[in-house]
């Protein structure tokens, strides 16, 4: 932003980005046709499309007639060949420069996806667009961002390609970092040097992010991370280690116990520079006065204008805690992207996280949308076919042929399908979205949930969203209980469909804040019963519980810090802490996480909601 006659005006870069956004969203149908034509023309000779008989055709009709809608499992053998060193044009004509890895939080196995220069440049423009909208909504002067960003370990595939998270692939790209640094105004570099981001030790990296953020507190204009969870984890750590951080600032040297990597110590030394007892004293007074740490962000970073991270989907649970930490500082939901590619931009950044919508970028990919039937819970259960009534998961509509980007209907639900420059052709993303409106000819999407069924024992079908509703319903009992003097609250949760015994049953794991871990036995039993009843909104579940085809729901209360152990388990396996999303259901194949959860269990409750005798 630039100053002119006392008013903030947009920089040249932001003006160009806004013009591009308006142009492409206005001409969305033409842009989509051209995007598909470019993808297919560029990749006309690749093996996958030749096998399907596309024969160089580039129109949407021929493409849809010959190329099937697929999942990752369908493309994985082709991707594996590329990773193993097959240099022929298997999925893309352009060279594959790296492999991107998903977080792998649900099944315990990380998906592999192709990364190339097209995705790099699309991501660069995506980030520039994000900055432009943020700068328009929250104009700031030059300063810094307290950015909780973490690189992940990389592996080398059999074919010699680097495999890591998509964000790490971007951060390791000289073109990406140079493009971000080349912005004119405002200049908002991270508080932390890159050595901190790429520290091999997550706890060391987190500690140094906090240390650098406190040392440069007056310059901080924003607090950000890829996901809300990362900011919450960081500020929870601050609650524990603020005295150590103040001691480091007082003596002008990082704790040798906390910061052990030589390159990281060298990188933060110039920021520490010299002992600063005055700053240490001021920080100690502010931290000591916080009490429950409400408003810690404006207390320690008074010039922060906003807090930005993805706050939709599985991140919704952390919004309440993040709002607690942020005080009056606005929460800004990040944009809509995935390991597969960029999708939409949050163009209405003043909207609260609970109502954020994303405007699809028509030239990021070729988009299709599978019509879905929303959950139906008002039908009566049929004793002979309980699964037919009240299914709480989204299913394909009767006429489920995918529709184009500009043909979606406001108010309807869809699953996103993408065709990209990185070798994904009619790829089911697995995301359920609701069309909230249009910006010119381009739809604005509200993220609803992941479509995947996460809890099922018999004929029951419960999704991630259903789990969230059940936990939220029980949390109201916890919050409103007159005996809950120590104000227990749910810090985090996950679930598991346990079929190791007959009948199988749902297990929900809670970590609690407030009071002692073993407090609240009476109210927690009621919470357990309430979750069991809430899942009964799915007629298949309710009928199965009544007939004992599904056993009593089990609530396991975990030791404080248990979910931090889950995070560390994934980081130790090569996942990035910055891209970590708590798995809302842990599959039986994810034995390592189940072991962490079971080892940290301190109390167990079984539902009595269906005990009638």
Curated annotation (Swiss-Prot):
From the UniProt record, give one GO term of the biological process aspect.
response to auxin
Instruction: State the name under which the record lists this protein.
Output: Probable indole-3-acetic acid-amido synthetase GH3.12
Give UniProt keywords alphabetically. Answer: Ligase
Induction details: At very low level by auxin.
What is this protein's function per UniProt?
Answer: May catalyze the synthesis of indole-3-acetic acid (IAA)-amino acid conjugates, providing a mechanism for the plant to cope with the presence of excess auxin.
Provide the E.C. number(s) assigned to this enzyme: 6.3.2.-
| Tissue spec. comment | Expressed in roots.
What is the originating organism of this protein?
Answer: Oryza sativa subsp. japonica
Q: Which InterPro entries match?
A: GH3, GH3_C, GH3_M
GO CC annotation, single: cytoplasm
Q: Which family does it belong to?
A: Belongs to the IAA-amido conjugating enzyme family.
State the top-level EC class: ligase
Q: A Gene Ontology molecular-function term?
A: acid-amino acid ligase activity
- What positions belong to coiled-coil segments? none
């Amino acid at each position: 932003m630039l100053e002119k006659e006392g008013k903030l005006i947009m920089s040249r870069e932001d003006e160009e980005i806004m013009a591009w956004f308006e142009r492409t969203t206005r001409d969305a149908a033409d842009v989509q046709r051209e995007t598909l034509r470019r993808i297919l023309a560029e990749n006309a000779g690749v093996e996958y499309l030749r096998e399907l008989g596309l024969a160089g055709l580039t129109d949407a009709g021929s493409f849809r007639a010959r190329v099937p809608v697929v999942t990752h499992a369908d493309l994985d053998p082709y991707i594996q060949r590329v990773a193993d060193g097959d240099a022929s044009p298997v999925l893309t004509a352009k060279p594959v420069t790296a492999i991107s890895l998903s977080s792998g939080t649900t099944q315990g196995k990380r998906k592999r996806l192709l990364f190339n220069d097209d995705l790099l440049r699309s991501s660069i423009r995506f980030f520039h667009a994000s900055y432009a909208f943020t700068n328009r909504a929250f104009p700031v002067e030059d300063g810094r961002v307290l950015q909780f960003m973490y690189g992940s370990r990389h592996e080398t595939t059999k074919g010699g390609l680097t495999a890591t998270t998509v964000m790490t692939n971007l951060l390791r790209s000289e073109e990406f970092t140079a493009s971000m640094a080349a912005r004119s105004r405002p200049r908002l570099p991270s508080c932390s040097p890159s050595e901190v981001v790429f520290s091999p030790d997550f706890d060391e990296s987190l500690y140094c992010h906090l240390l650098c953020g406190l040392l440069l507190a007056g310059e901080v204009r924003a607090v950000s991370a890829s996901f809300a969870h990362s900011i919450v984890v960081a500020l929870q750590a601050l609650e524990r280690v603020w005295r150590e951080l103040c001691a480091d600032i007082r003596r002008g040297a990082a704790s040798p116990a906390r910061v052990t990597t030589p390159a990281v110590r060298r990188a933060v030394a110039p920021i520490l520079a010299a002992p600063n007892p005055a700053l240490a004293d001021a920080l100690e007074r502010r931290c000591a006065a916080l009490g429950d740490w409400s408003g810690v962000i404006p207390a320690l970073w008074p010039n922060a204008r906003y807090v930005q991270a993805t706050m939709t989907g599985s991140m919704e649970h952390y919004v309440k805690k993040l709002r607690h930490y942020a005080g009056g500082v606005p929460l800004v939901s990040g944009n809509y992207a995935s390991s597969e590619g960029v999708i939409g931009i949050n163009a209405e950044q003043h909207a609260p996280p609970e109502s954020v919508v994303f405007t699809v970028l028509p030239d990021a990919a070729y988009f299709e949308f599978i019509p879905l039937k929303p959950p139906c819970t008002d039908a009566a259960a049929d004793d002979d076919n309980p699964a037919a009534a009240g299914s709480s998961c989204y299913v394909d509509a009767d006429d489920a042929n995918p529709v184009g980007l500009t043909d979606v209907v406001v108010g309807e639900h869809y699953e996103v399908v993408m065709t990209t420059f990185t070798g994904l052709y009619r790829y089911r993303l697995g995301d359920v979205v609701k069309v909230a409106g249009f910006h010119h000819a381009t739809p604005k999407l509200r993220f609803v949930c992941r479509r995947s069924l996460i809890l099922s024992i018999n004929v029951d079908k419960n999704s991630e969203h259903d789990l969230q509703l059940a936990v939220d319903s029980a949390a109201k009992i916890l919050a409103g209980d007159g005996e809950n003097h120590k104000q227990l609250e749910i810090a985090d949760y996950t679930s598991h469909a346990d079929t190791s015994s007959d009948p199988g049953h749902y297990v929900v794991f809670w970590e609690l804040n407030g009071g002692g871990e073993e407090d609240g036995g009476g109210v927690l039993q009621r919470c357990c019963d309430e979750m069991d009843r809430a899942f009964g909104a799915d007629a298949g579940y309710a009928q199965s519980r009544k007939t004992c085809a599904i056993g009593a729901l089990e609530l396991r209360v975990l030791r404080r810090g248990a979910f931090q152990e889950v995070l560390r388990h994934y980081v130790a396996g090569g996942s990035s802490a910055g891209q970590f999303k708590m798995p809302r259901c842990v599959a039986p194949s994810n034995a390592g996480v189940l072991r962490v959860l079971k080892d940290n269990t301190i109390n167990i409750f079984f539902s009595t909601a269906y005990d009638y005798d």
